Amino acid sequence: MSPPAHGSDAKPPPQWAGLKSISSVHEATIHAAVLALLPDPATVRNCLDIAEDAARAVHGTMAAAHIGADPERMIAAPEEVDLQILRDMNEDSPSQRFERIAGAFADWKRVSPDRESLLLDDCRGDLSRCVTAECHETALVVAPCHGNMDARDAFYDLLFREHKLVLVPPPDAYTGNLLAHVVIGWKPHEHAQRAVVAARRWLVAADRITVLCINDKADGSYQRTARELLDQLGLEGEVVAISSGGRSVGETILDFARSATATCLLIGAFKHGYLLELLLGRVTRHLLSHSKLPLMMKH
């Protein structure tokens, strides 16, 4: 399989000033604290807005990268290449998708002079290779979970191949105050613990943290382990235990988040595996489908 292609050596058009794809841009991208991954033109602004907030909250660097599957730049089975070519009929060609993303990125940059130094990396070819190339070293990746095929495939790779901490933008316009009140959905399982540990840098910066324990055991093990983890990580937060009643756990989390005026949710994602969650509609799938808040997660 050939390595992913990073842009070209040609000088970008004037309207794309700042969109150079050179080794220095890629180097800055892979070492950023927060990466806005841009596979879908429809979610560019939300991803960039929330990534900017996430980076600013921890006094870290931000980067932005376009990734896209391109059958002309990949070595793959004929069926995969045919699928990508067929997909172009519905979603435009790889170059057209990049042009739309680059244009949206340039529009976003023009809003604030503070964004002038931010450049857009570009990786096209085999999508999994591009995800690895752009995201492997990044602490937090902001990426959509829905949208075009690139967005859906990249989201899967981020969680299950790269095991990244992923921040999914809300479906509507992002309104700011990312870390005003972070609600953590907690069960004493490894995937939930990994998510909290990975997000510690952002939890330290949060104004308020609530750890939500739903349907705790009789011995109070959910609440006890939640307090222990907060202590181990040097975090201050409230631990709340509630019953789901007749609701699903996903519904209960969202109802609580609304009542508590949460600004971000943090969960351990897909405890039962991706396919089982898709088939049975478990907690992660429900939150991804119905949450109006930014959703931070790690598998």
PLM feature segments, named:
Residues 1-29, 69, 103-141, 233-265, ...:
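Structural beta-alpha unit
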Residues 36, 140-144, 184, 267:
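Redox-cofactor binding/interface segments in oxidoreductases and associated redox assembly factors
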Residues 66, 145, 268-270, 299:
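Short secondary-structure boundary segments
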Residues 149-157, 161-173, 190-201:
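Active-site glycine-rich loop that binds ribose-phosphate moieties when present
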